[in-house]
Amino acid sequence: MFESLPITVLDECEGQTNLGDNHEIVSFNLDVLGKPVHLQVGVKDKQARLADIVPAARVLSSRIVETTMKRLQDIGASVPCHKGCAACCTYHLVSISVPEVFRLVQETTMMPLERCGDIVDSCSKVAKRINRYLVKRIAFKKLTNTETNSQVLAFEIHGEELEKLSDWYIKQKLPCPFLCNGLCTIYEQRPATCREHLVVGTAPCQFDKDDAERKMKVPIRPIRMIDALKLLASDLEGTTQESIPLLCAFDWYRGNIQRSNRTWSALTIAERFIGIVRAMISQSNRMRAEQVKYVSKEGTRS
């Protein structure tokens, strides 16, 4: 199995024996909130797609989340988030990066046919509602997909408009189509935004979902993996940084099939990704150090 994958996350106990020939091991350490986070990646001497970096990004994201949760618990904060809690999944508008879209489509098509069809249909129905909402609020354009000759709605939303869309979405009370009996059917493959969404509080975050203005206590994260993946795709493809609402992923993909098949050397993708993550973590650490320095200085003055 290892030999067929261009980029593979390795456990600490795994050596180079499982990777076959023509490979390179890339290891790096990160300082996350003062704690070491290590990742070791096996990279084959072959071409890779953007989707191939996503498993490594997921593992790294989970390790950073674990470190963040431990740090919060060390200072006495309560983090009620756990596997099986779907409180946020029933209202939160999740955005994902281009590499995650491509990987999600691959993994969804490997599900049982009926389940795959249900998910795609559910997403498409909500995507149409989102598009109708956006048509009323935001300038948009139609793109023709040369492969299917279908019309694909392309849009970019940021800042205030994204907040308005999120508030509108909350009021629709739409559960994530990947939920089944309250459980995430793609939990191990869930988007970085989902795995990094933590809530700090003294009780589980069940609340009245009619209250779109409610603001939960969300801790500052050392890094948002979606930002790293957005920058990676933008860097490699020469495009603007893009994020796509999860529920629009399949519709968006149909207009970008050719992009999903573009390849680069696996080593290029892995090294670019690692470089981006390192830079983001370093910037986060510098900002944290400046905040500590500022608080300390203000305390001395008082």
Question: Model-found features: residue ranges?
Answer:
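Short loop/turn segments that flank or connect secondary-structure elements
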Residues: M1-S302
